[in-house]
Swiss-Prot record:
SUPFAM superfamilies noted in UniProt: alpha/beta-Hydrolases (SSF53474)
Keywords: Endoplasmic reticulum, Glycoprotein, Hydrolase, Membrane, Protein transport, Transmembrane, Transmembrane helix, Transport
Name of protein: GPI inositol-deacylase
One Pfam family this sequence matches: PGAP1_TMD
Taxonomic lineage: Eukaryota, Fungi, Dikarya, Basidiomycota, Agaricomycotina
Subcellular location: Endoplasmic reticulum membrane
Active-site residues, as the UniProt record annotates them: S206
A GO cellular component annotation in the UniProt record: endoplasmic reticulum membrane
Length: 877
């Protein structure tokens, strides 16, 4: 028989004997249970696909956005200072070509801080709009708006670093911003003392907002008047992989509460279309400092914008950048911070007080009979708020009635989607809504509206809805133009959407406009403003909110949904129905529970490792990973799910208990408890998928690298020379280059060597089971390390490598190096009872930490896992 067929025959005989021997060692009492892990794999794949489809559907239904593209002619001039500040970063002055021709600075300084991997050139959209608007006003001589101030935009070049993933990068950038503020003010020393600016306005995008706030120490905060942030996660960090990042957020909150000179914060949020951050974190709690308070507003409620915006598009979206630029221009001419905040509210919130105009501004009047003491007038295609209402009873002189006015969207083509993709809303596509309250109904209302087109008048009615549906009681023609609904029992959570069904009567006019006003959580009131606009189209409207109760937030949930419907009496609303849509909870979980995908599979893997260790203590043999996984699926996993559900139920019953909102999935509503069990089963299935993939890769790698010599393989000691060489190289790198190479890189190299050792091991023996277990467990820890390696590699490439304080700590490199050493020497678990007992305790702590706080405080798992590996190695050596 030829050599190769003889070798394959002997190989098959060897494998059959090994499989039979292994089956005798670890018999499976219930053969059908071997399919449980495969079943969970299939469920995990199907559920992952369902989550993906739900996310896409949710974005299609609620996350569509429309913005007009912006254009500019940018130029940048780098500022050179004699004082040494940084050779790593730089500061530039923006100038719009063809407009900003002067070299000297005479305006109000605004410093732009880019976000994660952001470029300093992103300032060009807002800066260009500010320059164009300023010179247009000068040309038109609008002296009531322009007072000689213009905006000088400065922009920080932070080398497009990954500030969202690296806390020390955030700290270094904050120090540079502090120096920039001092240097910018020094650029105005050529002006007379009374004309020199004493404060700088900070404009920041994404994580640049965190950098800007971190720079506000007691000294620097005096030199800053207002901080404006765009799509910045203020409440929670986007990734909870570093303890130092949480420390930064805690320091920022402490400074905001205790530094009296801290500048007010204006946060502009993109809403549901922003999938890079959770817009729940863009909201702001209410901090009052004198008359200056922070405000957060979502772009869906900004007048003239009325659309959610993608994370990067919020910088260049024309409707937003025009309004921000105009707001900055107006604020630059205000004398104090209070006046600047009032200006900001006028441009961002449609901030209006009751207006009483003593004299009419138009000679033409329209008379309307009074149908109710509360009336709402709708002026179609009215971009102006010049509105006067007078109440006349025939016996006395007409008197002016106070009115509350606002501009709402009103597209020219009602058949187009709202907002229109690629264009959004036009400045002329608005309608004026004026609300008045009369003293009696036996009067006539005169409206001065000569410059307006069609004006519709009707009553304003309030409806308190106990259930989920409201229906018109009368069959008479409707005289109502404004409905206000309060569904007081509606469940509120940022994880839940509601489907709103509007039934219309015979329609001869424009379709009704629906305004959904989100009621913020208690601690967000007076600081966070969110509203969304929809048009009745015959299809269900999906209502969502970011400022209500959200995961991991200590805010109490509130019940009730508020709606306003503006309609023509010729197209009345007949019925309004509201129902919860639990399927979209999966879509909302994508951005809010990213860390669950990392933390909970580690918890399940720790359960498997604990089961293997306990089985070894009882039998003296190492159970294969996949066999242990199947037994966990049959016995331990259901118990763990029940414990998770029990813990989440207790959490929902104690919403006011300190820090309890950070446990499990961070939800305080009983209706959200099943989500804990669903994600628990899903993450267990993900572990099964990862385990089978790694096992298959190890088998394939073994087939590639193994070189057969007859039916016997070389001894482990002679095959492990390459492994020993790797251990020596890694040890030398860890000791000799301790200040250069981060421990995360050493960990990754050790995982690679563990894979090679597992692939070279003799299959189906205790040594192979031990090495494959170590390879699978350490592979699940790679996501906790890979970001640091990516940041370090990029910094090496750009010549600005920097490590955090623990990156060069050899303590974190000891366990993987020793694991590779044990794998190379053929070590196996010894019955050292003290080490095994300590290792079991550490495993239990890691399990509890993974499931209880791993979704919020994910960084806590890495040091605990490191301790587990140390104790595990101690039981092997």
């Amino acid at each position: 028989m030829p050599a190769w067929p003889r070798f394959m025959s002997l190989r098959r005989q060897y494998l059959y004997k090994a499989l039979d021997k292994n089956h005798q060692k670890h018999p499976i009492k219930h053969p059908h249970t071997r399919f449980l892990s495969r079943l969970f794999c299939a469920l995990a794949v199907l559920f992952s696909y369902s989550i993906y489809q739900s996310f896409r559907t949710d974005l299609k239904q609620s996350g569509s956005w429309g913005c007009e593209m912006s254009w500019m002619s940018p130029s940048y001039r780098r500022l050179e200072w004699t004082e040494f500040i940084s050779t790593r970063y730089a500061l530039y002055l923006y100038r719009e070509q063809g407009l900003d021709s002067e070299d000297t600075l005479s305006g109000h300084p605004v410093l732009f801080v880019p976000g994660n991997a952001g470029s300093y050139q992103q300032v060009r959209s807002i800066a260009s709009s500010a320059s164009k608007q300023y010179y247009e006003q000068v040309k038109a001589r609008e002296r009531n708006v322009v007072t000689g101030k213009k905006i000088d935009f400065f922009t920080a070049d932070l080398k497009e670093e990954f500030s969202a993933f690296h806390a020390r990068t955030v700290r270094e950038q904050a120090v540079f911003i502090q120096h920039c503020i001092k240097g910018i003010l020094q650029e105005y020393t050529h002006l007379p003392q009374e004309k020199r600016p004493t404060q700088v306005t900070l404009l920041a995008h994404s994580m640049g907002g965190v950098v800007a706030r971190l720079a506000m120490d007691p000294i620097t905060s005096i030199s800053v008047d207002i901080i404006v942030t765009l799509s910045t996660p203020h409440i929670l960090p986007p990734l909870a992989l570093e303890r130092d990042m949480d420390s930064i957020y805690s320091l920022i909150r402490w400074r905001r509460q205790h530094i009296s000179t801290h500048p007010p914060l204006i946060s502009i949020c993109g809403g549901i279309s922003d999938t890079q951050i959770v817009s729940d974190s863009c909201a702001l709690p209410f901090f009052q400092a004198g008359n200056n308070s922070d405000i957060a507003v979502f772009t869906t409620g900004i007048p003239g914008v009325w659309t959610a915006v993608e994370h990067q598009a919020i910088i260049w979206c024309h409707q937003i950048r025009w309004r921000i630029a105009r707001m900055l221009l107006d604020m630059s001419s205000r004398a104090n911070t209070t006046a600047k905040l009032v200006t900001a509210k006028e441009w961002l919130l449609d901030y209006q007080e009751d207006e009483t105009l003593k004299e009419p501004r138009s000679e033409r009047q329209h008379d309307y009979s009074v149908s109710s003491r509360n009336m709402t007038f709708i002026g179609l295609h009215q971009p102006s708020k010049a509105f006067v209402a007078q109440q006349c009873n025939g016996l006395e002189r007409c008197r002016t009635v106070p009115s509350v006015m606002s501009l709402l969207p009103f597209p020219n083509n009602p058949s187009d989607p709202f907002p229109l993709p690629g264009e959004g809303i036009k400045p002329s596509e608005v309608m004026l809504v004026a609300e008045i309250s009369l003293s009696s109904t036996n009067t006539v209302v005169k409206i001065n509206a000569s410059q307006y087109g069609q004006t519709i008048a009707g009553s304003r009615e309030h409806h308190l809805v106990k259930g989920n549906s409201w229906k018109v009681n009368s069959s008479l023609p409707s005289l109502t133009t404004h409905h206000l609904f309060h569904f007081e029992n509606a469940f509120l959570s940022s994880l839940v959407t509601h489907s709103l069904d509007i039934t219309l009567g015979h329609c001869k006019d424009f379709k009704p406009l629906i305004k959904h006003i989100s009621q913020p959580a208690l601690e967000l009131q007076s600081a966070t403003f969110e509203s969304n606009y929809y048009f009745a189209s015959g299809r269900p409207i999906h209502l969502h909110s970011h400022s209500t109760a959200g995961p991991f937030l200590p805010y109490q949930d509130r019940a009730g949904i508020y709606l306003e419907i503006f309609q023509s009496p010729l197209c009345p609303v007949q019925q309004v129905s509201l129902r919860k849509n639990y399927y979209n909870v999966l879509a909302k979980s994508v951005t809010r529970y990213r860390m669950v995908v990392l933390a909970w599979p580690v918890g399940w893997a720790t359960v498997v490792l604990l089961f293997q260790l306990s089985d070894f203590i009882n039998t003296g043999e190492i159970l294969p990973w996949n066999s242990a996984l199947e037994r966990i699926a049959r016995r331990r996993m259901p118990i763990c799910i029940v414990l998770l559900l029990l813990g989440a139920t207790i959490q929902s019953q104690l919403p006011d208990f300190p820090m309890l909102h950070t446990f499990f999935l961070g939800v305080n509503q009983l209706e959200m408890v099943p989500l804990v069990g669903i994600l628990g089963v899903w993450t267990f299935g993900l572990l099964c998928v990862v385990s089978f993939v790694i096992t298959a890769c190890l088998w394939l790698l073994g087939c590639i690298i193994q070189q057969p010599h007859g039916h016997e393989r070389l001894e482990d000691e002679t095959k492990s020379k390459h492994d020993w060489l790797g251990v020596v190289m890694i040890g030398a790198a860890a000791v000799l280059v301790n200040q250069v190479i981060p421990h995360q890189l050493i960990f990754l190299l050790c995982v690679i060597l563990l894979w090679l050792s597992a692939a070279r091991s003799k299959a189906l023996n205790d040594r192979y089971h031990l090495i494959s277990t170590c390879a699978i467990f350490t592979t699940l820890l790679i996501p906790f390390k890979i970001l640091h390696v990516a940041i370090w590699s990029r910094n090496i490439w750009t010549g600005s490598a920097a490590l955090v304080s623990t990156d060069n700590n050899f303590y974190y490199a000891i366990p993987p190096v020793l694991l590779v050493k044990c794998a190379s020497c053929g070590g196996t678990i010894q019955k050292r009872h003290v080490c095994l007992k300590a290792c079991r305790i550490a495993l239990i702590i890691l399990i509890m930490s993974s499931f209880s706080v791993g979704a919020r405080w994910t960084w806590i798992l890495s040091p605990i896992a490191n301790a587990v590996l140390i104790l595990f190695v101690a039981s092997i050596i």
